[in-house]
Amino acid sequence: MAAVAAAIPIEPIYNMEKLSYEIFSILESKFLFGCDDSPRLSPSAKNLPISVAGGGGRVRILSIDAGGSTDGLLAGMSLRHLEMALQKRSGDPDARIADFFDVAAGSGAGGVLAALLFTSGPDGRPIFTADEALRFLAENRGSRRKGIFGKLFRTRGDKRGRIFRRIFGDSTLKDALKPLLIPCYDLSTGAPFVFSRADAMETDGFDFRVREVCEATAAEGGRRKGTAVVARSVDGRTEVLAADGGGVAVGNPTAAAITHVLNNGHEFPLANAVDDLLVASIGNGECDGWRRAEDFVRIAGDGVSDMVDQAVSMAFGQNRTSNYVRIQGNNACGSPHSIKNSSSIDTEKLMRAAEEMLTQKNVESVLFRGKKVAEKTNTEKLEWLAGELVEERERRMACAGLPVVVLKQASPRSSSSTC
């Protein structure tokens, strides 16, 4: 009989209190109680010459919010624009999002996007381009059922995962091109559970099929075991009962991604503080009106996402404009396509609303001052980000020092009897 996740010795569950503690610990040490500028090297980098250990590049993190008011379409459109900009700036028409990021985290619709863009196909390249991923979201959004992926969840049992099975086949987390973090809410433990490539590399007990990971993070059946999505590890030893999806568990996974990098010295030996990171956090629009229970859930999710944005922006401090980019739509700007209830809006109109959000002025979080409207639009911020990502890749190609990222390699598949 399969054991629930809580029975496994290694625990990849990210408790929200722990996440808050981690990110605000950074705030305390860096801004609130004095600043220690001395570098803190991870164990794998302590014995290196200072010129090598301190001369590396930045770890590039991509974080994608849950559905938001655009059901994932704003993030999909942002990533399509970013991928096109990367192709243009790098001169490589085959460049993909996964080529320019070291870590990807996504929740809900954002988790599905991350899986589409970072899962390896038979040719060793991502199975979807950003444009194909956007079209996948648009085609499978569903217009008559509340929430994201209505078409995917009209039937129960095995039929529910038919589309994900067709897309991902038997690919598992080990097939992710880069470290991947995708959360859901686990009924077995009553806490968020994060599917992680790093944990999958350690043991088959944490290696899940990507199709089940996507079902889990996009689940919207409510917290009843009869409607929960079941995800089992490839060895059958770990079972996750996912309900409410990743959007309720961790709507904005940026803090989880940062915590993962700063506490993973094996794969990121030179990442000692937020100054060593380049973070792109992609939102999915905020609700500006609500009437039903699910709308209150959405607005609560928006509030949590904003809180994470504020915390991360504060952690970066003066470097927030060069190391941290947040792309988010603001429905309070008097848009003619203002979104009151995305489930009642057809996909074409929602796509137009997402396009308009990209033309809005970017909104930045400022230390102790809330938010301010930036001079650049969201589109211009994406263009700037593309330039930073291309420069970072070129810098790494020209540097012969210690790699910024040393990914764990997949070990031979162990049997279910292996401890």
Language-model-detected regions and their locations in the chain:
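Conserved catalytic cores and adjacent C-terminal regulatory segments
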Residues: 2-419
